[in-house]
Amino acid sequence: MYRIRVFGDPVLRKRAKPVTKFDENLKKTIERMIETMYHYDGVGLAAPQVGISQRFFVMDVGNGPVAVINPEILEIDPETEVAEEGCLSFPEIFVEIERSKRIKVKYQNTRGEYVEEELEGYAARVFQHEFDHLNGVLIIDRISPAKRLLLRKKLMDIARTVKR
């Protein structure tokens, strides 16, 4: 199992690098990430959240775990909805975030094969949230400065726990 990196850890702000090796090492890392995600009752976990600055994440929105490697968002529906989101890198913080209701995506599986699919609702939301992590974008970047100010003390408390 991995230790979750929390707000204040520099790896969360980096743009992750593409995966180039689809080997047993990657599969083992993904298995460990899935185990970690379930242990913390998450529905998604991006590689940067466990200290790996590479472009992949795992998610499970009810149909079993999926590994998403080198993802792209091909189309974003202009229709959006606002819903509450949490994040394992922000313990006990939940914020309302506006995201597209439907997206068309492309990614690679653990064998390096390309997968293209359309996601909507909760699956689209989780994909967008995890995709943000690969670009160094965090949930607090998606809220207003006023709301971020209200969370300032909690954020500072979380950042103090980061091992430097």
UniProtKB/Swiss-Prot annotation:
GO BP annotations listed: co-translational protein modification; translation
Iron recorded as keyword: yes
Catalytic activities: N-terminal N-formyl-L-methionyl-[peptide] + H2O = N-terminal L-methionyl-[peptide] + formate
Keywords: Hydrolase, Iron, Metal-binding, Protein biosynthesis
Cofactor details (free text): Binds 1 Fe(2+) ion.
Pfam families: Pep_deformylase (PF01327)
Binding site for Fe cation: C87, H129, H133
GO molecular function, one term: metal ion binding
InterPro entries reported in the protein's UniProt record: Peptide_deformylase, Peptide_deformylase_sf
EC number(s) from the headed UniProt entry: 3.5.1.88
Cofactor(s) the protein needs: Fe(2+)
Keyword Protein transport: no
Active-site residues from the entry: E130
Listed SUPFAM superfamilies: Peptide deformylase
Enzyme class: hydrolase
Job of this protein: Removes the formyl group from the N-terminal Met of newly synthesized proteins. Requires at least a dipeptide for an efficient rate of reaction. N-terminal L-methionine is a prerequisite for activity but the enzyme has broad specificity at other positions.
Family statement drawn from the similarity comment of this UniProt entry: Belongs to the polypeptide deformylase family.
Database matches in PANTHER family: PEPTIDE DEFORMYLASE
Name assigned to this protein: Peptide deformylase
Annotated organism of origin: Thermotoga maritima (strain ATCC 43589 / DSM 3109 / JCM 10099 / NBRC 100826 / MSB8)
Gene from which the chain derives: def
